[in-house]
């Protein structure tokens, strides 16, 4: 089925989603399965960047991911600790893989790394014990460090370092219009959180513990400019706070969390955040 036919079939099915179940057969199931396979192989992406830097969301692919939950029944998944099983609708990306398939894929997945089917992992990526949800895209030479999560349909660029315990939000619940996007050469510090469709532009650095959502103010302390929903290229962010409005009784109100751009990336920053090629051999 062509991409345009896939898109039309999935859009129509999504509008009639209340009629779809695990018993549904035929064109709709075939279209969703094909769309998920394209995502899994990296031949289609939920969001794509054009030459001008504008990201376009392929909403029909996101709809395909959502429809798969209606189409697929629960089943046991082997591999739990102590011979236990899990109970879910989405199989592992690695189900049925052997040595040759991993060598062909060209990335590292250490014990404890969980990737759900329809997520794409590019060559030379490194997955420590982490979780990559369905529909996500993790590009070449990116490190997803221990206990980090890459949410549904999130788009992670090349040579990105996602430090330990980072949360990259998904789009499925609560339902978001667009995925979180981390562009090439970014560094996301430990225990940071990027959610609600925020875009982190190329080369930006988030210090440890930066929390960004759709309404978080990002304040450039040099210029006073305020950004919302997007981190500028090569910005270095740290956690901050804005003074709150006085309360009705005149006492100072609580401050509001924000992120602060303290500088742009320089050579000193690069030396601290550059990736280690030895880990990707």
UniProtKB/Swiss-Prot annotation:
Homotrimer. GO terms for cellular component: cytoplasm. Substrate binds at residues 108, 145. GO terms for molecular function: 2,3,4,5-tetrahydropyridine-2,6-dicarboxylate N-succinyltransferase activity; nucleotidyltransferase activity. It catalyses: (S)-2,3,4,5-tetrahydrodipicolinate + succinyl-CoA + H2O = (S)-2-succinylamino-6-oxoheptanedioate + CoA. Keywords: Acyltransferase, Amino-acid biosynthesis, Cytoplasm, Diaminopimelate biosynthesis, Lysine biosynthesis, Repeat, Transferase. Pfam families: Hexapep_2, THDPS_N_2. Belongs to the transferase hexapeptide repeat family. GO terms for biological process: diaminopimelate biosynthetic process; lysine biosynthetic process via diaminopimelate. Pathway: Amino-acid biosynthesis; L-lysine biosynthesis via DAP pathway; LL-2,6-diaminopimelate from (S)-tetrahydrodipicolinate (succinylase route): step 1/3. Its EC number is 2.3.1.117. The keyword Acyltransferase applies. NCBIfam families: dapD, PRK11830.1. This is 2,3,4,5-tetrahydropyridine-2,6-dicarboxylate N-succinyltransferase. It is found in: Cytoplasm. InterPro entries: DapD_Trfase_Hexpep_rpt_fam, Hexapep, THP_succinylTrfase_dom1, THP_succinylTrfase_N_sf, Trimer_LpxA-like_sf.
């Amino acid at each position: 089925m062509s991409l345009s036919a896939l898109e039309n079939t999935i859009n129509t099915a999504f509008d009639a989603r209340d009629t779809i179940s695990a018993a549904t057969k035929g064109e709709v199931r075939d279209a969703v399965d094909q769309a998920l396979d394209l995502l899994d192989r990296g031949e289609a992406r939920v969001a794509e960047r054009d030459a001008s830097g504008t990201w376009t969301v392929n909403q029909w692919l996101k709809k395909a991911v959502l429809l798969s939950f209606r189409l697929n029944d629960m089943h046991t998944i082997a591999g739990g600790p102590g011979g236990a099983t899990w109970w879910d609708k989405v199989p592992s990306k690695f189900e049925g893989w052997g040595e040759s398939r991993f060598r062909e894929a060209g990335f590292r997945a250490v014990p404890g790394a969980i990737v759900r089917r329809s997520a794409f992992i590019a060559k030379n990526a490194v997955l420590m014990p982490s979780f990559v949800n369905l529909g996500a895209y993790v590009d070449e030479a990116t490190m997803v460090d221990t206990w980090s999560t890459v949410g549904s349909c999130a788009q992670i660029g090349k040579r990105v370092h996602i430090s330990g315990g980072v949360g990259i939000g998904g789009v499925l619940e609560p339902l978001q219009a667009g995925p979180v996007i981390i562009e090439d050469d970014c560094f996301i510090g430990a225990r940071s959180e990027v959610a609600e469709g925020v875009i982190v532009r190329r080369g930006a650095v988030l210090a440890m513990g930066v929390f960004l959502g759709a309404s978080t103010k990002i304040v450039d302390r040099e210029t006073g400019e305020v950004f919302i929903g997007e981190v500028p290229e090569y910005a270095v962010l740290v956690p901050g706070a804005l003074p709150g409005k006085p309360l009705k009784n005149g006492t100072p109100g609580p401050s509001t969390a924000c992120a602060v751009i303290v500088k742009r990336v320089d050579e000193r920053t690069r030396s601290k955040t550059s990736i280690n090629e030895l880990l990707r051999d």
